[in-house]
Amino acid sequence: MKTAHEIRPGNVIMLDGSPWVVQKTETTRSGRNAAIVKLKLKNVLLDSGTEQTFKGEDKLDDIILERLDCTYSYFADPMYVFMDEEYNQYDVEADNLGDAADYIIDGMEDVCQVTFYEGKAISVELPVHIVREVIYTEPSARGDTSGKVMKPATITGGGTVTVADFVKVGDKIEIDTRTGEFKKRV
């Protein structure tokens, strides 16, 4: 059992007797109340989706499934194909990746964990931190130095990340895949 706060994209939880793949997590904290965790879920059996809200300390049944370390191989619409160290290939539906698809790029060497349910690859869990190149961002705003200045940037893979004002096109940045937050320039 994990708390709702410990659940991250790629995990599979049992809810109402069915396995659900966590596609996205969003944690909201308020000064007075406990953290609220909103999960975007996809039912493995019925292929339907939903959003559920939990308190941060709520216990959820995290299903322990078979997981394999794999690397991304290629995209064959609508499947992402991953390969293990023995060159076995596993297809994962693009819908099951959620926001993780924004971080998957050709030639990436990051080792991902592919999760299986009843012999079928159902989700992919990315490493906690990955490095990607910024392919587009606005130039820094001159003189705007009051506080922590942030701006949107597009990274290889097509995802958008909010980065510090000093980041330029061509910079490599480290991203936390659990939250989608910029960590540092590499």
Curated annotation (Swiss-Prot):
It comes from the Bacteria. GO terms for biological process: peptide biosynthetic process. Coiled coil: none annotated. One of its GO terms (cellular component) is cytoplasm. This is Elongation factor P. Keywords: Cytoplasm, Elongation factor, Protein biosynthesis. One of its GO terms (molecular function) is translation elongation factor activity. Its main location: cytoplasm. CDD domains: S1_EF-P_repeat_1, S1_EF-P_repeat_2. The keyword Protein biosynthesis applies. It is found in: Cytoplasm. Belongs to the elongation factor P family. Pathway: Protein biosynthesis; polypeptide chain elongation. Involved in peptide bond synthesis. Stimulates efficient translation and peptide-bond synthesis on native or reconstituted 70S ribosomes in vitro. Probably functions indirectly by altering the affinity of the ribosome for aminoacyl-tRNA, thus increasing their reactivity as acceptors for peptidyl transferase.
